[in-house]
């Protein structure tokens, strides 16, 4: 049985649709079109509209017609040491930042078509944040935090160990990095918050809730800014509200002993506040009132572990729980719907991939990859998810068809990458 990987680019037509399917045209790309690698790990569209793919055989560029491949060859000077790439992001200057399988980070110059290693030695990257201000942060396996700034005119990179450069004698695990509307950069750690403020060439670092190593630590997990307030989530039901004008924090306590891992904006002045093990809260900012949604209060909720959440343009929540599938929550009528796709044999798809992907395109279509597998679009009128696939290649989804990546571009095209057993495909 031959395994093949297929990249489908779908053009969705923004008109009325027939029941059960969206009007669309498929364009299929395989190795015959120049996309020779069968594992694509990350997709982005740059500010010029060009598509980029991080693969296990280097970096691919797609201009809408042809694929170009950039990778290391023996004896060349391209600047890349490992062709297996895991993650790509674009910065404000148009460079493509690349994270490789051997935990190194490179900056790719699309104009010169060259990779450049960051000016930092002896590190192993774990995660990478590329902020709108142009700065890049790299969290390392060794629990270092590398801060990379780019000169706005020469584009020269400067990399420093954040903790050492600010005389911080001990480092803590990094939970997230966040940039606010004033271009302050916040580092959320297992032990407090740090805020980096830049004024020209001058930098100022402020710390909040940082305790000595032997004291009880205050971790921070997620951040959200709105209405002149920045919200930081923490442990034991705490959310800290920061006022940028006064520099003051106010602590909000929710009735739960669970850590609050997620905060998102709903419609109007409501917030979705998700916990690690006790469901979620809907918090009304103007009144300070909240409502607690967990399996005790709402038995239709499958479990209490909020793994991830996406808020769509209608202000409705799509939640990944520990239970496979996807949970849809409408805050207006407080209705829960749990969806799980079935394969072409009528069985629930639960063993394909654990991730939940939710994407909305410019035409207003909402695409759902439930935890467990498969791909569907949301039929909002009938409140159903409808399986979506190419009938020329498949008779339906199965556990062997693994969606490895999805992406919607600025033109409304939907990129779908999945593996398939050739023996099961239609001609």
Place the predicted regions along the sequence by residue.
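Carboxylate-rich, polar loop motifs that coordinate divalent cations or form catalytic acidic clusters
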Residues: 1-421
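A short, hydrophobic C-terminal helix/tail in secreted or cell-surface proteins
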Residues: 421-427
């Amino acid at each position: 049985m031959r395994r093949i990987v297929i990249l489908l680019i779908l053009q969705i037509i923004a008109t009325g649709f027939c029941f059960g399917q969206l009007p669309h045209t498929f364009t299929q790309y395989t190795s015959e079109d120049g996309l020779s690698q069968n594992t694509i790990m990350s997709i982005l569209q740059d500010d010029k509209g060009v598509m980029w793919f991080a693969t296990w055989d280097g970096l691919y560029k797609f201009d809408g017609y042809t694929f170009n491949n950039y990778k290391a060859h023996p004896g060349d000077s391209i600047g890349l040491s490992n062709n297996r790439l895991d993650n790509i992001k674009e910065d404000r200057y148009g460079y493509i930042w690349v994270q490789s399988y051997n935990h190194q980070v490179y900056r790719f110059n699309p104009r010169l078509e060259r990779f450049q290693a960051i000016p930092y030695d002896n590190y192993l990257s774990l995660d990478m944040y590329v902020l709108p201000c142009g700065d890049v942060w790299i969290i390392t396996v060794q629990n270092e935090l590398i801060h990379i700034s780019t000169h706005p005119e020469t584009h020269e990179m400067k990399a420093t160990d954040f903790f050492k450069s600010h005389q911080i004698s001990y480092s803590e695990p990094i939970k997230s990095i966040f940039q606010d509307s004033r271009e302050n950069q916040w580092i959320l750690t297992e032990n407090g918050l740090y805020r980096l403020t830049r004024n020209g060439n001058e930098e100022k670092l402020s710390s909040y809730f940082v305790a000595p190593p032997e004291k009880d630590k205050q971790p921070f997990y997620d951040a959200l800014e709105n209405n002149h307030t920045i919200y930081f989530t923490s442990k034991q039901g705490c959310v800290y509200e920061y006022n940028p004008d006064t520099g003051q924090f106010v602590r909000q306590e929710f009735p739960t002993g669970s850590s609050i891992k997620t905060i998102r904006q709903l419609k109007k002045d409501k917030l979705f506040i998700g916990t690690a093990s006790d469901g979620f809260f809907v918090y009304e900012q103007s009144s300070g009132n909240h409502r607690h949604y967990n399996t005790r209060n709402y038995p239709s909720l499958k479990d209490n572990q909020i793994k991830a959440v996406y808020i769509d343009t209608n202000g409705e929540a799509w939640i990944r729980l520990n239970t496979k599938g996807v949970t849809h929550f409408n805050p207006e009528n407080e209705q829960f719907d749990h969806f799980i796709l079935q394969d072409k044999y009528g069985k629930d798809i639960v063993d394909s991939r654990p991730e939940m992907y939710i994407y909305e395109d410019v035409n207003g279509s909402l695409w759902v990859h439930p935890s467990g597998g498969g791909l569907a679009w949301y039929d909002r009128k009938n409140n159903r998810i409808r399986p979506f696939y190419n009938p020329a290649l498949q008779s339906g989804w199965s556990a062997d068809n693994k969606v490895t990546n999805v992406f919607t571009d600025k033109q409304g095209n939907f990129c779908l990458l999945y593996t398939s057993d050739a023996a099961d495909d239609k001609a």
